[in-house]
């Protein structure tokens, strides 16, 4: 029951919430090797353009994933 794009690639990783940045990067790159992963503090204002090669990781003050990582 994962959310996938038209090429059957995973586009969301809800299972990574509360995991470490390192663990999240490893899992995402296994699923989507071309991903450009960007780590940002939760609450950071970001641009709204959609990029199929980008995954933003919003982290809490302990560098754990605070929001579901998504392609975009």
UniProtKB/Swiss-Prot annotation:
Pfam families the UniProt entry points to: potato_inhibit
Q: Indicate the annotated site residue(s) for Reactive bond.
A: 48-49
Q: Does the keyword Kinase apply?
A: no
Cystine connections: none
Which GO molecular function entries does the Swiss-Prot or TrEMBL record give? serine-type endopeptidase inhibitor activity
**Tagged with keyword Oxidoreductase:** no
Signal peptide, first to last residue: none
InterPro entries according to UniProt: Prot_inh_pot1 (IPR000864), Prot_inh_pot1_sf (IPR036354)
Write down the Gene3D superfamilies for this protein, in alphabetical order.
Answer: Trypsin Inhibitor V, subunit A
- Tell me the GO BP annotations in alphabetical order: response to wounding
Report TM segments.
none
Keywords carried by this UniProt record: Protease inhibitor, Serine protease inhibitor
- Please state which protein family the record places this protein in: Belongs to the protease inhibitor I13 (potato type I serine protease inhibitor) family.
Role this protein plays: Inhibits both subtilisin and chymotrypsin.
State the protein's name: Subtilisin-chymotrypsin inhibitor-2B
Q: Organism classification, top ranks?
A: Eukaryota, Viridiplantae, Streptophyta, Embryophyta, Tracheophyta
